[in-house]
A protein has these predicted regions:
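Conserved catalytic SET/PR domain of SAM-dependent protein methyltransferases, capturing the structural core
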Residues: 1-159
């Protein structure tokens, strides 16, 4: 007998799904979303001076805890369907997202050097396998992604 995923509706466009075997949570679209669509705005619930696995980096020493909190369940993918615009504080669809599809973003698009590196399990054709932050990736890979203004500034200073 297969145990069903637990789902929690969190907005007009998304729900959190919890895997019954691992307990991991992810955010999924409950409606179709189009490229360029602002799917949510966000704010800083708290500003931390160090990264942790729940923060989004906006400056060298500013890592924000997201508000609304359920945005923390937007997981990583090397083939993301949304970007975090940390300047406008908006999450924007970058390709069509079908109802039921997991909402994902590319963590190095906002993170310079992550608190915890991890092995990526996204299974995309372009999977990078180990995710550590933009500082650990070659420019030719990063140019394939839409990056936050902060990460782009870091790269500009590096070159």
């Amino acid at each position: 007998m297969q145990i069903a995923e637990k789902t929690t509706k969190v907005s007009s466009f998304a729900e959190i799904r919890e895997c019954p075997t691992t307990g991991s949570k992810s955010l999924h679209a409950t409606v179709n979303l189009m490229p360029g669509e602002v799917i949510s705005s966000f704010a800083a619930k708290e500003i931390c001076d160090r990264p942790n696995y729940l923060t989004v980096q906006i400056h060298d020493e500013h890592h924000i805890m997201l508000d609304p909190e359920w945005l923390q369940y937007i997981n990583h993918s090397c083939e993301p369907n949304v970007v975090f615009d940390t300047t406008k504080q908006e999450i924007i669809a970058i390709r069509p997202i079908k109802k039921g599809e997991e909402i994902t973003f590319f963590y190095p698009s906002t993170e310079w050097s992550m608190d915890r590196a991890f092995d990526c399990l996204c299974n995309s054709d372009n999977c990078l396998e180990t995710i550590q932050g933009a500082a650990h990736l070659p420019l030719e890979i990063l140019t394939n992604y839409q990056l936050s203004d902060y990460i782009q500034q870091k790269l500009d200073m590096k070159s």
